[in-house]
């Protein structure tokens, strides 16, 4: 079939398998052209491995460090008549290129929050890899069925303690509008912490450690975003921020557990990028459109692959890690450059419907958004007939 982008709200409901493959190849080429990660990981588990930062971590480990990788994700395959999810096509492409390089790459499709998927992952590590020396936790999910209670909990994006009114960008209508969000209830805050906080990360590490599949010296990291003053009311000081602060609490006991065997656990702070998750946050499209303009003019703009490759090479496995007073690894320092933030703040209130394209890089934002789904990739013929039914050989599909 011939597949064109169809966008509804903050989701593109179509995906392009050839475009997704080309996007993965671009990321692989970035890593191979920037050289190996010295003393990098060799057997890696990525939880949330199919898109965004998790996919970038899988690519960086495999093609920057020659690592065997096991990826866990929740995606949907395509059929003859309907495209699958972008994450499915990304993972199919990754496995294809890894196999060409002689690297082990296997994937598990299912609910990473469940005990069942954790057990299947452990069994697969025992059978195929023995032990893993790096665990990357990169899950973004709107809800979680708690494995111990069976309760399905939802996360909420709201301020805490007060209602907040801010400028937003309606990406469908391409208009600037005021958005008011009411404060989260305590139940909503608790739910967000349960879905987006550190409990599941801790459950994963406990399960892997108890099963004896963590190598001596194993490291783990969970990805987070902090942002700066302009996004704090809705992000760091909001319900999502409460979940992110929970990561900072949980990492302490995870670090203590791994340190016994010479390992380490860190929260890694990454910059704001266009992802399916960030496009759902009301103020992020405007913030990102301004940030891209400023950072591109400065020559410091980065996407997922630049961020994660740099994080692994410089901070997780390098001699001079960027680390803050909380013990977090920082890859967001170019975004938080005071000059960059000052320029974003100065332009924030000046953007109007009429000057949106001149004042911001909304055009770049839209391109990045479509690239998530395999569109707007250079060299891809979008008028060609493509087969949306792409197989992932050897996948362990717990959803089938």
UniProtKB/Swiss-Prot annotation:
Source domain of life is Bacteria
User: What is its pathway?
Assistant: Lipid metabolism; fatty acid biosynthesis
Q: Which of this chain's residues are annotated to bind NAD(+)? A: 48-53, 74-75, 111-112, 139-140, 244, 273-275
Q: Which Pfam families match?
A: Eno-Rase_FAD_bd, Eno-Rase_NADH_b, Enoyl_reductase
Query: What InterPro entries does the database record attribute to this sequence?
Result: Eno_Rdtase_FAD-bd_dom, Enoyl-CoA_Rdtase_cat_dom, FabV-like_NADH_b, Trans-2-enoyl-CoA_reductase
The entry's keywords: Fatty acid biosynthesis, Fatty acid metabolism, Lipid biosynthesis, Lipid metabolism, NAD, Oxidoreductase
Site features described as Plays an important role in discriminating NADH against NADPH, chain residue numbers: 75
Which reactions is this enzyme annotated as catalysing?
a 2,3-saturated acyl-[ACP] + NAD(+) = a (2E)-enoyl-[ACP] + NADH + H(+)
An example GO BP is:
fatty acid biosynthetic process
Gene Ontology MF, one: enoyl-[acyl-carrier-protein] reductase (NADH) activity
The family classification in the record reads: Belongs to the TER reductase family.
Question: Which HAMAP family did the record assign?
Answer: FabV_reductase (MF_01838)
Its assembly, as annotated, is: Monomer.
Purpose: Involved in the final reduction of the elongation cycle of fatty acid synthesis (FAS II). Catalyzes the reduction of a carbon-carbon double bond in an enoyl moiety that is covalently linked to an acyl carrier protein (ACP).
Q: What is this protein called?
A: Enoyl-[acyl-carrier-protein] reductase [NADH]
Species annotation? Burkholderia vietnamiensis (strain G4 / LMG 22486) (Burkholderia cepacia (strain R1808))
Q: What is the lineage of its organism?
A: Bacteria, Pseudomonadati, Pseudomonadota, Betaproteobacteria, Burkholderiales
Report the gene name.
Answer: fabV
């Amino acid at each position: 079939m011939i597949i064109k982008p169809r966008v509804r709200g903050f989701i593109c409901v179509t995906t392009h398998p050839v475009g997704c493959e080309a996007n993965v190849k671009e990321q692989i080429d970035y890593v191979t052209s920037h050289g190996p990660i010295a003393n990098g990981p060799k057997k890696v588990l990525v939880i949330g491995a199919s898109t965004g930062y998790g996919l970038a971590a899988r690519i960086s480990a495999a093609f920057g460090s020659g690592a065997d990788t096991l990826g866990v994700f929740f995606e949907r395959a395509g059929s003859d008549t309907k495209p699958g999810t972008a994450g499915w096509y990304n993972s199919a492409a990754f496995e294809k290129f890894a196999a060409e390089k002689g690297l082990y790459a296997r994937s598990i499709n299912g609910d990473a929050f469940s005990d069942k998927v954790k057990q299947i992952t452990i069994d697969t590590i025992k059978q195929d890899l023995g032990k893993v020396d790096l665990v990357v936790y990169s899950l973004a999910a709107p809800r979680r069925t708690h494995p111990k209670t069976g309760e399905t909990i939802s996360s909420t994006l709201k301020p805490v303690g007060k209602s907040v009114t801010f400028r937003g960008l309606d990406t469908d209508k391409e208009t600037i509008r005021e958005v008011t969000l009411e404060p989260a209830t305590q139940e909503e805050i608790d739910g967000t912490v349960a879905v987006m906080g550190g409990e599941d990360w801790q459950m994963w590490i406990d399960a892997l450690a108890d099963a004896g599949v963590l190598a001596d010296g194993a490291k783990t990291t969970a990805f987070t975003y902090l942002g700066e003053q302009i996004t704090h009311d809705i992000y760091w000081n909001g319900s999502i921020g409460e979940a992110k602060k929970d990561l900072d609490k949980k990492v302490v006991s995870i670090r203590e557990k791994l340190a016994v065997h010479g390992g380490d656990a860190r929260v890694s702070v990454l910059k704001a990028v266009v992802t399916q998750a960030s496009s759902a946050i009301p103020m992020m499209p405007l913030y990102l459109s301004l940030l891209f303009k400023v950072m591109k003019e400065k020559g410091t703009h980065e996407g997922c692959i630049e961020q994660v490759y740099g994080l692994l090479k410089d901070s997780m496995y390098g001699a001079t890690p960027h680390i803050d007073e909380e013990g977090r690894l920082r890859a967001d320092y170019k975004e938080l450059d005071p000059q960059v933030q000052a320029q974003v703040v100065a332009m924030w209130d000046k953007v109007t419907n009429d000057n949106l394209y001149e004042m911001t890089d909304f055009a770049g934002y839209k391109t990045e958004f479509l690239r998530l789904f395999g569109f707007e990739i250079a060299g891809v013929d979008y008028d060609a007939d493509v087969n949306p039914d792409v197989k992932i050989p050897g996948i362990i599909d717990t959803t089938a």
